[in-house]
């Protein structure tokens, strides 16, 4: 169904839509599990399969619709947001939402029909199913005792709830953050930097050693390199993941160690960014001001020194370098006049001899060649050799340049950068494995605040800019998802209290559990784990919906609030555990994924699995406690028989 919807709206099969389909495996079975379990429960109470299926479907129309719309609504803010996240995850979000909606329709139609045909009376007492049911019945009674005792100590329970919720903030603030996990893309790059006045022949003397470092790796499949006079670019394409033992991150570190031994060059080892548009360097920190370039360079060099001293960088440097030697020919106009040399003619002669300009063409054997006059290379290697050049003087006589000109040598920047029409310098860096991009940027921001005077601003470029801009969108998207879910549930329950009970009793606790693992270093806060956190809101809300919906019905049948919620939680214990187990097992392959693309899958898998396990356990105790505190008391509903007499509705008997 999801693939059909993708075809209808023009989505493509790509890594993110495939990830959505993998995630949907653990999501779409939930509604069917709840329906089939409810049919089985009615059969155990003595009803025939067909009436049991009809009754179960009627009971669960509301909860399943609420669960389906809730989970689908979670993905709406993801799909409609702009920027990089919106561009990447639009198809992902709507593919998952479509799969969830289809699963809800199937759960209300196909699932009860199949349950009425395939489930039989007495099956739950025989064989392995009977053994499992007896063990679960014992566990259900134990849970009932635990819940009953827990509700007697609600102040302690609410204190624990407040502590767990408060942990969300330190877990989130002190977790490593990056735009996306580093991925093994089977390539390691090397950026080669030579001195500003280096020639191509000089650079080639050393770039062969760069090639040799890459070629020495057993994991190497092919090596490429492009060399220019002042640097170059190269890299190694590795063998497939199955044919090597080391990741590209490990090879990056080994390559950096090998490059450090090469004289005459500076080679920066790096891996490509995990997302498009990130630029060459993960750290790209911009300082902008109206100040002179030399002052910008001084402050940038101070920050580079702080970066190396912090131990967070494999490489750091600024792109504003005052290392370009420049020789200026200064003419003495008085001497020019005394020797009868025309200034424009002297300049033209110098341009012809040194500039290498095209002046004409000639043909040989039908082929055309350019005429480029220039003195021999050996005679123009150093600025001092300019003094031996002759230019045309009076009466076409040659006059030595040294008789009327002097050389002035200076050092200038290779180039000057602008950022938003201001003079700017960029500090670019590479971080080692185990250090997050946010940690490196935070360090630079902190040091810049101490070093830079007024009139200087900091900004970002490349992957660093993406992290800062996309990272700020998460809280807004998360809040919008929460508001949408609350409004959907409020409309479904016709109450503002019930949605609060559902969300307060499940979502903060699941978020705390999911953020525990980034806090411990098992993963990072990135766009994939953020998508997992938003998905988690819809998933754990399902458990609260089942409990609150059934507790309200039991109150209408005459139960008091405490007994109603205990019976509701006990009755819905099995589907809650089954849906949690299905979701966890469906996402477990993401947790243990290896190879290309494993970083993204690990991140979203760890977030969902940890959040579902911890959130579901807490939900079984905190939702009933908050229900007792917040839920309104529902009056007993009396029905009228065909004679117009009031009758009491039949109570659902559940062994507690």
Protein language model features and the residues they cover:
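Transmembrane alpha-helices and their membrane-interface boundaries in multi-pass membrane transporters
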Residues: 1, 25-35, 39, 60-80, ...
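Alpha-helical membrane-interface segments at transmembrane helix boundaries
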Residues: 10, 53-65, 85-97, 139-154, ...
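Hydrophobic transmembrane alpha-helices and their membrane-interface caps
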Residues: 1-41, 48, 80, 98, ...
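Extracytoplasmic/periplasmic membrane-proximal domains and adjacent transmembrane bundles
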Residues: 36, 268, 297, 304-481, ...
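Signature of alpha-helical transmembrane segments and their immediate interfacial
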Residues: 60, 128-179, 236, 261, ...
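Flexible hinge/switch segments at interdomain interfaces of large molecular machines
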Residues: 114-125, 179-187, 225-230, 266-289, ...
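Transmembrane helices with small-residue packing motifs
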Residues: 11-12, 78-88, 158, 162-198, ...
